[in-house]
Amino acid sequence: MFALVDCNSFYASCERVFRPDLKNKPVVVLSNNDGCVVALSKEAKNLGIKMCDPWFKIEKEYKQKGGIAFSSNYELYADISSRIMDILEQLSPRVEIYSIDEAFLDLSGVSNCLDLDIFGRDCLETIKKWTGMPVRVGIGPTKTLAKVASFGAKKYPQTNGVVDLSSKDRQIKLMKLMPVEEVWGVGRKIHRHLNGIGIKNAYELSQLDLNFIRSKFNIVLAKTVRELRGEVCIDLEEEAPTKKQIVVSRTFNSRITNLKMLHEAVSDYAARALSLIHI
């Protein structure tokens, strides 16, 4: 069994740690020179704010609606991330740091002596108590199913941030509710091709013939399908392999024609990529 621990609105939540009065209020984080939005809370999204929105265009209306903005502080974010990962390494013997705000845990020993839902809630509460950071926990027999569980924990508030997919019935139920483009490893191009053959959700993807997947797509997607069926194909990487490249990217909401705005975004994502080197 695996758990995926994922921080909620990581950058915005880091800022809220020191400003508890901002709980449930719109928060955005701006690029290095306050040029555009690079992270935002759920409440800010509900106001219609989007990633890479130019700050000068939205500042007045956003502040009128009670929104708060912070300049990005990558040293702070890296420090809080390190604290969270240290906690996770105390809770599980094997941890894979997947990104600055995500980690996979090996629960093979835990599942023999503790209810996994209880473990997930203990994990959530411990991180909240020791760091002030909100997280969600997805639990499943494979890393891909743990990702599915994390999707459920984010999508459905009634889960209170923890979803355990030990049960096959629960796996099927949630996969039927999960759009195929949300599946870990399904990129935009593959998503379009899958939609073209009538595959709309994760469960429909899991039922495709593996030979068909290998011939029409690739072996990576075939592994994803096998993982959705509960077969472990992707093990934990406790020591990350040497990377030939580090990519941090986002899709702009509209065509960017302002060179200053483009420079702001490139500078910010370069800083994010650099922060990954130190994790």
Please place each PLM-identified region on the residue numbering.
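DNA-contacting surface of Y-family translesion DNA polymerases
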Residues: 190, 195-277
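Gly/Gly-Pro- and Ser/Thr-rich, intrinsically disordered tail segments characteristic of DNA damage-repair
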Residues: 1-226
